[in-house]
Amino acid sequence: MPVFGERLVADITKEEVQEAVKVMKAGKAPSLDGVATECLKMGGVKTVEWLMRLLNLCFVSGVVPIEWRSACIVPLYKGKGDKNECCNSRGISLLCVVGKLYGRVLIKRIRESTDGAIGEEQCGFRSGRGCTDQIFAVRQVCEKYLAKGKDVFWAFMDLEKAYDKVDREALWRVLRLYGVGGKLLKAVQSFYVDSRACVRVGSEVSEWFTVKVGLRQGCVMSPWLFNLFMDGVVREVNASVLGRGLELLEASGRSWQLSQLLFADDTALVADSEEKLCRLVSEFGRVCERRKLRVNVGKSKVMRCSRDGGASRIGVRLNGELLEEVQCFKYLGSQVEKMELVETEVKSRVKEGCKVLGALKSVMSCRTLGMEAKRGLYEGVVVPTVLYGAETWGVRAEERRRLNVFEMKCLRSMAGVTLRDRINNDVVRFRTGMVKRLEERVDARVLRWFGHMERMDEGDW
C-alpha cells in the first residue's frame, strides 16, 4: 500500500490550479449558477490566484460551499420506449465548474499516490490502458489454454447501478487503507456532506432532494474513487479463495494467478475448472453484498471455452439462482466465442459497420457532397466501428475477404456506382482516394499493438 505523505496534505499550489484549468474541457453545459469553463480559462493570472486562495480555504477547513455539493440532473431520452417513463431516459448531472476544478486538483494527488497500488486486473480509467487490453487478455487466455487442450471457464458479472450503490462509509475505509487520510480525505468527504440534487426539464426545476449513497455522477473524482473501491473487492476475493483462477507462466519463468479482469465495474471471473469458478462467483457475490453492491443475476452470464464447443453444460449458481450459460458473450463491445473463433468477431464488426453505413447512406450517396467530406465520415465513423478491437485479431484469408467485400461496398456507395456498372475495384479506390485497404489497417494495428506490448513493464500483462 502507498505511504501517506506530506505532499498529499500540502497547500494547493498555483501550478496545480493552472494545470487543472488547462485540462478542463470547454464547451460543457454549466450548472444552475451559469458559470462556464470558459470563464476560468479566459480569466488569466488573477483568476488563478483567487481560485488558489479559495481552494486552499476549502482544503484547510474541510468544507465546501453547498453549490459545489449540488447537482442539476437533466434527463436525456435514450431514443426508445415511452418518454414519460424515467427508465427510458439517462440523467446527466451538471455540476458547479469551480467545484469540478477543486475535485480535479484533489484526485490528481490521490491518483499519483495510489496508481501503483491498484492491481493489474483493472484497466478502467488508467493511463495507457483501455478496453483493448482486456479484450486481448481474454483472447490470449482462451487461445493458450485451448492450444493445450484445456478448457477455460468464464463468468461475466453485471453489477446493478454500481456507481449509485457504492457505500460511502466503506469507501472512506478503503481510501484510508490506500494511504489517503488527513486533510485530503476530509476534502473528498466534504463533497458528500449533505449532497443534494434537483431535476431540470426544460425551464422547470424540481425541489432539492438529499443524496445519501453512491458516487457523484459527473464528478471527475468518481471514476478513480470507484477504481479504488473495486480494487478492494478484488483483493478481498483473492484473499478468500485459495488456488483461485488460472496459473499463468511467462517464458522468463515468472508465474502469477489470474482470477479477475476488470474495466471499471465490468468484471470477468476466470478459472480452469467449474468448481473453481463456482467458488469465485460465490465469493465475489458475498464480498459485493457485504459492500452493498448488487450483482444482477439475470444479466450475469457464464461460458465454457473448449475446443469441442463445450458439449457438456455447466451449473454456476449465485444466491441459489443459476447463471445463464451462453455460447457467445459481448465483452466490452467485442464478441467472445466459446471456441474462440475470430470469424465470429469479424462477422459481428462487419454487421455493426453495415448498420453505420445504412444510417449514413443518404449522405454517402449524395452526389452534391464532396468526396473529402465523405472520406472524413468513412475514416471517422465507419472504419473505427469495423476495426474496433482489431489489434486482438488473428485474421485468416476468409476474414480478409469479408473485410474487403464490406470495404468495397462502402467505397462504391461513396463513388455513386454499383456492381452493375462493372467498374474495377482499383478504379473505385482511385475515385474515392482510399488506397489503403482495411486488411492493411488491421495489420498496422496489430503491429502497433505488438509495440505497445513490448514497451510494457515486466510486471504488467
For each feature predicted by the language model, list its residue ranges.
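Surface-exposed loop/turn segments and immediately adjacent short secondary-structure elements
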Residues: 1-86, 93, 101, 118, ...
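Active-site-proximal segment of RNA-dependent polymerases
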Residues: 1-17, 63, 68-72, 112-165, ...
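Short linear motifs embedded in intrinsically disordered, charge-biased segments
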Residues: 3-8, 17, 182, 199-219, ...
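Residues that mediate protein self-association or partner binding, especially
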Residues: 21, 77, 110, 142, ...
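Conserved catalytic palm subdomain of right-hand nucleotidyl-transferase polymerases, strongest
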Residues: 27-35, 73, 84-94, 132-176, ...
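Catalytic-core region of right-hand nucleic acid polymerases
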Residues: 56, 104, 108, 162-186
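Conserved pre-motif C helix in the palm subdomain of viral-like polymerases
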Residues: 87-118, 136, 163, 212-243
